[in-house]
């Protein structure tokens, strides 16, 4: 029987707590190359459920899945210099096959914008072919200097969508639509509240005209970018000659977007909802929604029969696991808590005798005795209540830790206090943001959509009057 290791309290050392819960929650093993991960069933199951639910959303929008190659020739990449320049430090490059040097370097995809240009060019001839919108589920390679499971890794999994449109208005509208879709998805399935906004020029995606983001607050007060959408304008289509004939038979370049979310969301789940007992997985993406734990079922044919009956009732409407091992009920409960199963059912001798079970919520640890006849109804209601509570707790924490500051000395203090700070800023230069980051460790997360006030305020740095507010925070 594997011993359950002690988890460092998150208040004591958040980074160590994160490492402990990732390890003890049976989420990963480390791969043989720095920054690579082996996704265990408990983490890959989360990703599978994210895929399942998001694919339903894509299908409802009429968006189809495709898969493009992992390998990109250097000649194709170089056509969009600004794009390759932004990724240059992270590009993994193949130069040899066996002992033979390649005639051209091959890149392992850091993202797929350039590959989609070749695809779109073959797909689009007329305005009647537009819009073209595709999604792919893929792995990408970015040679990160500093790695952290799920948050920054050499290889990670993601969803990336790409679209081509007839007009700038249509493409811009779709960029915002997908950001709202991500926001709703995180709220509905991951129980994570976010702040929507536009990235500053310094923080936008290389090659994009503008980038939009969802910023989530982790329990240590740091921000985590949890989904982005990019309005690419004609930056890529002009470089790769992706054009169409308009209604007047004139050549035009398409307007494009790209948008993605990744396995970084697993890290967001851990750091938004986890506690000192382990991880807490939101019910609608949990690989196992209900753990059925019995007191030594193999020692009693009657209890084993009762456990089988409970499993049969629950396994159709829910994702269920039954622990039939001879481990103690206390050990099983602790293991279930560490692994973040939203709801567990404990079955002891008295429960069996009364034809009932004990339901235990992972989020509050509240216990409830339920008749086997009501178990489906109560389990469904309880799982929804768990999701709602996780979201409300995260929403309250976000609201209570956002402050508006106009004075730079106060700004530095609040950043040191692990707050999200919203401040007026007219200084749009990268140098101003670099200076703030150097002094405080905070970066400009976004220009929030919902926090732009009428009238003008003094800029945090130069004191000129501005209408623009920017969200700053330390971030992963």
From Swiss-Prot:
The principal location of this protein is cytoplasm
Q: Which Gene Ontology terms cover its molecular function?
A: ATP binding; proline-tRNA ligase activity
Alphabetic keyword roster: Aminoacyl-tRNA synthetase, ATP-binding, Cytoplasm, Ligase, Nucleotide-binding, Protein biosynthesis
Enzyme Commission number: 6.1.1.15
Location in or out of the cell: Cytoplasm
Task: Enumerate the Gene3D superfamilies for this protein.
Answer: Anticodon-binding domain, Bira Bifunctional Protein, Domain 2, C-terminal domain of ProRS
Which BP terms from GO are recorded? prolyl-tRNA aminoacylation
The Gene Ontology CC terms held by the record are: aminoacyl-tRNA synthetase multienzyme complex; cytoplasm
Record field: catalytic activity: tRNA(Pro) + L-proline + ATP = L-prolyl-tRNA(Pro) + AMP + diphosphate
InterPro entries documented for this protein: aa-tRNA-synt_IIb, aa-tRNA-synth_II, aa-tRNA-synth_II/BPL/LPL, Anticodon-bd, Anticodon-bd_dom_sf, Pro-tRNA-ligase_IIa, Pro-tRNA-ligase_IIa_arc-type, Pro-tRNA_ligase_II_C
Q: Pfam families attached here? A: HGTP_anticodon, ProRS-C_1, tRNA-synt_2b
Q: Which CDD domains does the entry mention?
A: ProRS_core_arch_euk
Q: Domain of life here?
A: Bacteria
User: What top-level class of enzyme does the UniProt entry assign?
Assistant: ligase
Give the domain section of the comments. Consists of three domains: the N-terminal catalytic domain, the anticodon-binding domain and the C-terminal extension.
Q: What does this protein do?
A: Catalyzes the attachment of proline to tRNA(Pro) in a two-step reaction: proline is first activated by ATP to form Pro-AMP and then transferred to the acceptor end of tRNA(Pro).
Q: Which HAMAP family match?
A: Pro_tRNA_synth_type3
NCBIfam families assigned? proS_fam_I
Which family is this sequence assigned to?
A: Belongs to the class-II aminoacyl-tRNA synthetase family. ProS type 3 subfamily.
**Subunit organization:** Homodimer.
Q: What is this protein called?
A: Proline--tRNA ligase
Whose protein is this, by species?
A: Mycoplasmopsis pulmonis (strain UAB CTIP)
Q: What gene name is given for the protein in this entry?
A: proS
